Structure formats: C-alpha cells, structure tokens
Amino acid sequence: VPRGPRFIAVLIAVLALLHGLPWLVLVASPGWSTAVTVIGSAVFLFAAIGFPFAMMRGHGRHHADRSAVAADAWLGIIWQFFVWSVLGGVATLVLRAFGVHGAARPVAVVVAVVTLGLLALGFQRAMRVPPARELDVVLPRLRPGLDGTRLVVVADTHFGPINRAGWSRRTVAAITALKPDILAHVGDLADGSVDQRREQVAPLATAPATLARVYITGNHEYFSGAAEWIAHMDALGWDVLHNKHIVVERGGDKLIIAGIDDLTAASSGQPGQGADINAALDGVDPALPVLLLAHQPKQVATSVAAGVDLQIAGHTHGGQMWPFHLLVRLDQKYLHGLSRHGDRTQLYVSRGAGFWGPPFRIFAPNELSVLTLRSPEAAGS
C-alpha cells in the first residue's frame, strides 16, 4: 500500500470531505446550542482521525477483528450520512433560492432520521438469512431428462470479522429446505484465513445437493491464500472447480458444470492460479450444455467466446449500499439478474448472500438464487 506524500494528501482530503460535509449539514449549519455543536464536532473529529487507524489495524498485518468491525461499520455509517447530507445540502440551497430560509435545522433532522432509519433497516437486511429468489431459466440445449433441475446459488458469503457461525447454520438450513439438485458457491467465501474463519464455514459441509456441490474462488480468496481455501472446501466435500469441469447426469441426459478462477487470480502472485477456460472445458463433448461458474459478471465475454450456455456470477452484491451501485457499474455492467449475450449465452448475477465490509444492505437485498433449469421441450409443453 502506498505511503508517500501524495497518498497521505489524498487520504486526508477524502476523510475531510467524507466527514466534513455531514458535520456541516448536521452540526454546524443548523445553529444548535454551543454544547451540542461542540459535542457533535468532537464526535466527527474523533471519527475522522480514528477511522483510518482502525481500518489499518483491522485489515492490515494485525488482522484485528474488533478494529475491523468498528472500521467497517463506521465506513457504512459515514457513507450513508455523506450521501444524505449531499441531498440535504442541495435541498437547503433549493429552498433558499425560493426564499425559504431557516431550513437548515429541519433538513438536518430529516437527514439524520432517514440515514439512521436506513442504517437500521440495512443492518437487519445484511444479517438476515437470505430469502430465496426463484427463476426459471430455459436452456435450449438442455435435454428433457434434466428439465426441472434446481440450481441453488450461494454467493459472496464473506465470512469475516463478525462471527456469523449462527447465520451460517441457519442459511444452510434454508438451503436444505430448497432441495437443491446442484448447489453452487460462486466465490468470495470468506475474508481471512482458514484458521480464522473455520467455524463460520463449517456448516457448509452439511449442505445437501442430489447431483453436485461445486465451488469456485472469488477475488477475496486471493487476499488470504486461495490454495488454502481450495483445499479446505475440498476437505468439506465440495467439488472445487479450479479450471476444471464435472459431468452430472439425470434421466439419461448430461450437463457440464465447469468453473474458472477469478479474474484477479493470475495477478495475485499465488502459484497455479489464473482463469483458464480452455483447461476448464478440456475434453468436453461440444453437444452438451455447459453451466459455467465464474465469479465476476464481466467474465461473460469469455463465456460467450467459449459457447457457454449459462454463466453464474456474483461479486457485485447488487451494489450493497445505495448509491454505491453507480460506482460498481463502472466496473461491472451487469449488477444482478438474468441477461442474454451473443447467440447462446445467458448470464445470471446473484446479489449474494452476505456482505463485504460495512454490515449493511441498502436497496440491494441479499438472496439465495434458485434457478430451475428448463429444457425447451418441457417449457413449451
């Protein structure tokens, strides 16, 4: 991580803006009493100074989970206060232009109430067991024997500094109730090492599927050692699709399930890592339909070139915290849902089951994606 003067200057500017605007709208402008103004100013100053240190201690070499929890939570809180303070500041200026003065205090109250309400709702949505989002997907090359195959997708669990072992057990119970034929985890399993997150991941060993349980790496596995997570998921009984494929069969008909590494794998510096669609599909019968697990939606270009029938991705969290989706869309055109690409390929992007960093989901609900694969013959009957 850079530590030069330019980096320090940019960091100070970002922290000043992120904390300064909410301070201006909520504390300085409304004309509160001296005591309220002093206390409010002290809170924002302490947070602006303490936040980067907590972030470095939590996510740096110390990997101190308590510091990470505090820093991540504050990042989400101050982001929402910043966003709504921008809107509140604009509202105040518009009202002033129309001759309405003295709006700063009611605007501050509205900004505070809306922000705190959304944060409370967002925390509940982030920590809940993800609800099922069900969808039928017609695959033109799928044969009738595999019609009705239930593919349950769990993505972006991000087991991390907040111990969610109980959430993990309840989520596996929800998966069990969905009766998957194929259970797919499409990466970003955890933030941290296997030793740190073993308890949270353990319930996945009992998650059932009648045909296959398959897993691929996301970009976050490469922050803590992808090889260790690959070995651990293999030990839990999952098929790790590390640039490889398996064949599942039902009713005399077959489906290829392939997986490739995340886009960041090749640049991670970790031996043997890097997306390789040719290796993943080596020896595949070209007449068979292909389901590909690839963590990032923009890997769909690879899927189209390889003639994949359906790519399953995660990574985006649907934006996780409004309006962060606008920034995510700069990198990933497809944030969630089903889309078509080229003559054959379809892409489904899951909003994910968990959260990264701030424990909030605002206007981007979590989900267990339940895709019922349909053959055209059965779908048309």
Residues of each region from the PLM?
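Non-catalytic terminal accessory segments
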Residues: 1-128
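Hydrophobic alpha-helical transmembrane segments in integral membrane proteins
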Residues: 105-112, 116-141, 160-166, 224
